[in-house]
Amino acid sequence: MERANRMSAANMIRSLLPLVVVSLLAVGWIAFRQGDPDPVRPIDPTSTVQLAAARAGYAVQVPSELPDGYRPTSARTDAGDAVDGAPVTLQIGYVTPSTEYAGYVTSDDPGADPLTDVLDGAEQEGTVQVAGEEWTRSTTGRGETALSREEDGVTLLVTGSAPDAELETVAAAIAPVAAR
């Protein structure tokens, strides 16, 4: 009979209660420490840009000295596979101050996928002057603005869901990559 009293439901609850409290405290502490409100993870595109600049047969230009709030989140190039004289394409993606996307592409291959994916089927809407350069303004099939221009056989493209003013800020910041 004494054994039956020791195994009552009340005794079981009293035994488990400290475990439940400790578990809830541990879960709450972990959740609190991981509660980063900004999911954007900026990257440093320098190595990708330098690789493209070293392998390209043209003077690579990229957005530089962008104002606060423009954070690079992706960078890729096909320069790692390029042989002498082969075309080189460089792409850099940014999150803008309005938390929208702005993408930059430069390539000496007019048929490069990152260019054709945006420009094929885009409706040209005229030109716009940005930092003394004339850019063709288009609307893509997804309804996004695309600013493009060609310079010495190299296409420069700025596009994305960001407002036009932010895309123009990216375009205005484009400058040649400094040789290292």
Predicted regions and their residues:
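Residue-level signal for functionally critical sites in structured catalytic/ligand-binding pockets
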Residues: N11, L19, F32-R33, I92-V95, ...
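Functionally constrained cores in energy, signaling, and assembly domains
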Residues: S15-P18, W29, E100-D109, D117, ...
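Generic detector of leucine side chains in alpha-helical contexts
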Residues: L16-L19, L24-L25, L51, L66, ...
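A short, solvent-exposed beta-edge/loop patch
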Residues: A31, Q124-R180
